């Protein structure tokens, strides 16, 4: 099953994360299928997203982790996905 989840980057005590699409059973920092954005928790929770690609993966059945889903909700992308499901 395909998941949207975070991989850790950055230095010690200065984390940054990539939002990636990868198989559910792969390692946290293993090979990703696609890189979909960045999340910087120490910089006022700055988020950079590739919206069209994320929506495409969600429409095709990729499941976000709890953390990624909360990031998408804050960015307003989850509402767009829910709206597109109703059509």
From Swiss-Prot:
Superkingdom of origin: Bacteria
UniProtKB keywords: Ribonucleoprotein, Ribosomal protein
GO biological process, one term: translation
SUPFAM superfamilies cross-referenced by the UniProt entry: Ribosomal protein S16 (SSF54565)
GO molecular function, one term: structural constituent of ribosome
Keyword Ribonucleoprotein on entry: yes
One Pfam family in the UniProt entry: Ribosomal_S16
PANTHER family xrefs: 30S RIBOSOMAL PROTEIN S16 (PTHR12919), SMALL RIBOSOMAL SUBUNIT PROTEIN BS16M (PTHR12919:SF20)
UniProt cross-references to HAMAP family, sorted A to Z: Ribosomal_bS16
Family the UniProt entry places it in: Belongs to the bacterial ribosomal protein bS16 family.
Name of this protein: Small ribosomal subunit protein bS16
């Amino acid at each position: 099953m395909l998941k949207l989840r975070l991989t850790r980057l950055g230095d010690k005590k200065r984390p940054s994360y990539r939002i990636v699409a990868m198989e559910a059973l792969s390692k946290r920092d293993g090979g990703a299928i696609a890189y979909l954005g960045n999340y910087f928790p120490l910089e006022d929770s700055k988020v950079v997203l590739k919206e069209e690609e994320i929506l495409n993966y969600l429409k095709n059945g990729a499941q976000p982790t709890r953390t990624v889903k909360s990031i998408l909700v804050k960015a307003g992308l989850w509402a767009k996905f829910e709206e597109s499901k109703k059509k």
